[in-house]
């Protein structure tokens, strides 16, 4: 996992993809429709999301390991080439088969991330994240 976060900080997405098994699933829980499978698809998704970044340092707060499963709580700092910064707290589940990732599931708050991003970052994503309404009884 250390290799993954070092590669992410450098934005070496080729190295990230090499750590993933052919059947690795990568899911951002706020956007389940954007779930991808396999190293090439994972790299393409990361290239889209991290476009315009200079680096992505990550601080690990908690790491719990049990056999092939690792739970991580972390803070990412998105350093845009334009000087803007965005901080994102993330909880994640990682599963491994040998040295390869088979599952990468990130839990994070979309509004927190989108509210901090410059307008030029992924302009096709609306900045107002809809909230769920609770039906009246």
Task: Indicate residue ranges for each PLM-predicted region.
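Hydrophobic/aromatic beta-strand elements that line small-molecule binding cavities or substrate pockets
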Residues: 46, 58-64, 75-77, 89-95
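Residue-level signal for well-ordered, solvent-exposed loop/turn and beta-edge residues enriched
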Residues: 25, 84, 100-102
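A solvent-exposed, acidic/Ser-Thr-rich amphipathic alpha-helical stretch
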Residues: 13-69
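A short, structured loop/turn motif at beta-sheet edges
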Residues: 63-69, 95-102
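Short, cysteine-centered beta-strand-loop-beta hairpins and adjacent loop/turn segments enriched
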Residues: 52, 78-87
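Short acidic-aromatic low-complexity motifs
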Residues: 1-22, 134
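Low-complexity, intrinsically disordered terminal/linker segments enriched in charged
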Residues: 105-137
């Amino acid at each position: 996992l250390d290799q993954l976060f070092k590669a992410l900080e450098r934005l070496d997405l080729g190295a990230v993809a090499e750590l993933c098994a052919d059947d690795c699933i990568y899911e951002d829980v706020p956007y389940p429709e954007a779930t991808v499978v396999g190293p090439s698809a994972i790299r393409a998704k990361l290239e889209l999301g991290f476009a315009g970044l200079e680096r992505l340092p990550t601080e690990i707060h908690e790491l719990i390991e049990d056999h092939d499963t690792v739970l991580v709580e972390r803070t990412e700092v998105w350093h845009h080439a334009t000087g803007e910064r965005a901080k994102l707290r993330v909880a994640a589940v990682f599963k491994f088969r040998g040295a390869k990732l088979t599952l990468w599931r990130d839990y994070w708050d979309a509004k927190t991330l989108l509210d901090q991003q410059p307008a030029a970052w992924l302009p096709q994503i609306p900045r107002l994240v809809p909230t769920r309404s609770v039906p009246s009884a």
